[in-house]
Amino acid sequence: MFDIVPIRIFGTSSIGVFLATNNSVTFLPPDVPEKIDDIVRNTLRTTVARLTVAKSPLLGIFTVVNDNGVLLPPMVLEEEIRLFKALGLNVEVLNTKYTAISNLILAGNKVALVSPLLEPSVRKVVADVLGVEVIVDTIAGNPLVGSLAVLNSRGVLVAPEATDEDLKKLAEYFKAKTDLGTVNKGKSFLRGGIVVNDHGALVGDETAGPEFMRIQQVLG
């Protein structure tokens, strides 16, 4: 059963900027209403951890997570790092000039597509902490690879700017089906509107019927 549930957080359908998940835990900001905890547990079938990065609720922008580990940006606070480590995941702070690291890394459990913008010295850390093979590439010539696609072990949903060539490459990299899709009535910033793992997906509440169907086809 792969459920797709529409939600709104802090008055916006851009839920993916606030949440991040793998197959066992979902990161939520401290001020999200309790009822969202239940939706997360029932849909993504994970535990819930309430966290911040640099006191910000933007966990979906400032973390990269898979089933093996979590990457954090340079401005994360020591006490926050301790809370991430308490979850039992590999945790590492990336020594990079970038803060919105989720825009630069599209991470599965075996492979991570990494933006050419990310410093070469950081790539090895990505590989080690997430336990993945690192591939450096763009999507449709855009280096913000983590913002233009979402994935689980079954599929990769990619923004409509992607070419057939992009879809073919991504299918090869991640060994999964790929297709184009949007969220929240035509938005191609997929990471901003979809929070997905192998069990289910949360989507922004502006997501339309055909978008639901495509998400189900590719990721469900």
UniProtKB/Swiss-Prot annotation:
Which classification does the entry list for the species? Answer: Archaea, Thermoproteota, Thermoprotei, Thermoproteales, Thermoproteaceae
Concerning its family, UniProt says: Belongs to the eIF-6 family.
Question: Pfam families attached here?
Answer: eIF-6
- Gene field: eif6
Say if the entry is tagged with keyword Lipid biosynthesis.
no
Task: Name the SUPFAM superfamilies on file.
Answer: Pentein
Q: Which GO terms describe its molecular function?
A: ribosome binding; translation initiation factor activity
The record's section on InterPro entries has: eIF6
Q: Which UniProt keywords apply?
A: Initiation factor, Protein biosynthesis
The record's annotation in Gene3D superfamilies points to: L-arginine/glycine Amidinotransferase, Chain A (3.75.10.10)
Q: Which domain of life is it from?
A: Archaea
Species of origin: Pyrobaculum arsenaticum (strain DSM 13514 / JCM 11321 / PZ6)
Q: What is this protein called?
A: Translation initiation factor 6
Keyword Nucleotide-binding appears in the UniProt entry: no
Q: Could you list the residue ranges that cross the membrane?
A: none
Q: Which GO terms describe its biological process?
A: cytosolic ribosome assembly
Q: What does this protein do?
A: Binds to the 50S ribosomal subunit and prevents its association with the 30S ribosomal subunit to form the 70S initiation complex.
